[in-house]
């Protein structure tokens, strides 16, 4: 869960990019500086936060490459305080998001944030309950959190995706090599081979906006 302030974030450039590439999403989202927002700034005539702009780019990537997002059932692994679920359901009212996280404090924050925002098309699910979801999950998303986990912590999530037979997986890693986390702060082994081992094949890869490059990856489960 991101709770810091990244002072080098290119707010103005990102607003210009989002206004050019995803105007509907940018117009649909507002920032009031309330729960979950550590820094709100005025840029290019709009009050924004890093989380708002990142959400525009992430949802825009899914819109371009995943058919049926408007009515998809989404599993958000590492949901944090719930900002992705809030903004996905705000821009796609027919979608539904299951929010899960291995940290209990994140799930508590997520529940309170959803209640504060009046989000009705999302629900918090404890990790041990995810495999019991009976509705079909169309896509799972993991935005940065697996880069903060060990391979041993990632594996159970992938096993759960196997159980649920989730056809698509979107991952936004910290680094292009999908480095995992280690206790001493050094880069751990890549978790990309584990994704492949569970039958997922990379079908879309995008390096993100020039002003804030990162890796957006969409995988499809092989038949």
Regions found by a protein language model. Give the residues of each.
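Conserved beta-strand signature within the Rossmann-like core of class I S-adenosyl-L-methionine
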Residues: 165-177
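Conserved SAM-binding motif I beta-strand of class I
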Residues: 96-101
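A short SAM/SAH-binding and catalytic strip from SAM-dependent methyltransferases
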Residues: 140-152
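Conserved Class I S-adenosyl-L-methionine-dependent methyltransferase catalytic core
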Residues: 1-69
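A short, conserved alpha-helix within the catalytic core of class I
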Residues: 149-161
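Conserved class I S-adenosyl-L-methionine
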Residues: 70-80
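S-adenosyl-L-methionine
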Residues: 111-134
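Glycine-rich SAM-binding Motif I of class I
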Residues: 82-86
């Amino acid at each position: 869960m991101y709770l810091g302030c990244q002072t080098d974030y290119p707010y103005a450039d990102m607003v210009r990019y989002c206004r050019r590439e995803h105007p509907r999403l940018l117009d649909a989202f507002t920032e009031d500086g309330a729960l979950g927002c550590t820094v709100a700034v005025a840029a290019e005539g709009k009050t924004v936060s890093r989380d708002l702009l990142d959400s525009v780019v992430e949802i825009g990537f899914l819109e371009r490459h995943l058919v049926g997002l408007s009515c998809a059932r989404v599993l958000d692994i590492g949901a944090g305080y719930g900002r992705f679920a809030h903004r996905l359901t705000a821009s796609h009212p027919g979608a539904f998001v299951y929010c899960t996280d291995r940290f209990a404090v994140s799930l508590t924050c997520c529940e309170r944030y959803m209640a504060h925002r009046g989000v009705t098309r999302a629900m918090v699910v404890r990790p041990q309950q995810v495999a019991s979801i009976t509705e079909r999950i169309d896509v799972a998303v993991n935005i940065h959190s697996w880069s903060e986990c060990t391979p041993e912590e990632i594996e159970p999530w992938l096993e759960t995706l196997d159980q649920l037979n989730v056809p698509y997986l979107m991952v936004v890693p910290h680094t292009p090599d999908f480095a995992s986390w280690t206790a001493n702060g050094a880069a751990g082994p890549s978790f990309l081979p584990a994704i492949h081992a569970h039958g997922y094949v990379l079908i879309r890869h995008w390096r993100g906006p020039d002003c804030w490059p990162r890796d957006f990856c969409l995988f499809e489960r092989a038949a």
